[in-house]
């Protein structure tokens, strides 16, 4: 994250990440959150938050109005994921997307055993999950290309460590830095 960046955090939850970026990197910006309790938590942290439904897109924001737009564990909850990827690239000079990587080897093993995976990043049973889609590192590469987005950097994360070798199989989280 660039020092002093103007940031938009989509699905910001309690605002903890944005608060940390403000404190440690001198960032400014907004969180967008739909949940009442999370909006209150943002306000209590001193994080500027807008209570909006991402199904309606980001039409309130001009092109390139943020240095960075974050979608950290948000994409898998969105019905309009493809639209929101394009919107992320439109309103931000760059976007950072992170999501649970369904192709991580323990997930594959669960499916081979006939069960949907339940992990730290996918902590719900199939019947009560807020995730409406699952994706893989490689699937996102294809999706970004299909939507005319440039992948500036991509890697996986596993137990706090960066995974660059075989991230589709070895990483529980996929992370992409994108732009138009």
Short names for language-model regions:
Residues 15-19:
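Glycine-rich SAM-binding Motif I of class I
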Residues 1-4:
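Conserved alpha-helix/loop element of class I SAM-dependent methyltransferases that forms part
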Residues 68-79:
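A short SAM/SAH-binding and catalytic strip from SAM-dependent methyltransferases
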Residues 57-63:
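Short conserved loop adjoining the S-adenosyl-L-methionine
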Residues 82-87, 94-180:
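S-adenosyl-L-methionine-dependent methyltransferase catalytic module, highlighting the catalytic core
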């Amino acid at each position: 994250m660039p020092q002093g960046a103007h940031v938009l955090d989509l699905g910001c939850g309690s605002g903890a990440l944005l608060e940390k970026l403000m404190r440690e990197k001198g960032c400014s910006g907004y969180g967008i959150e739909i949940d009442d309790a999370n909006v209150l938590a943002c306000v209590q942290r001193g994080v500027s938050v807008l209570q909006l439904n991402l199904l309606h897109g980001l039409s309130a924001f001009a092109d390139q109005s943020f240095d960075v737009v974050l979608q950290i564990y948000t994409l898998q909850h969105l019905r309009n994921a493809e639209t929101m990827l394009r919107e992320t690239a439109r309103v931000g000079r760059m976007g950072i997307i992170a999501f649970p990587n369904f192709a991580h080897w323990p997930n594959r093993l669960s499916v081979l055993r006939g069960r949907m995976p339940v992990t730290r990043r996918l902590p719900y049973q199939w019947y009560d999950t807020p995730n409406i889609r699952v994706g893989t590192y490689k699937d996102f590469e294809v999706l970004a290309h299909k939507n005319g987005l440039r992948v500036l950097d991509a890697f996986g994360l596993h137990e706090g460590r960066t995974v660059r070798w075989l991230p589709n199989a070895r990483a529980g989280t996929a992370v992409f830095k994108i732009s138009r």
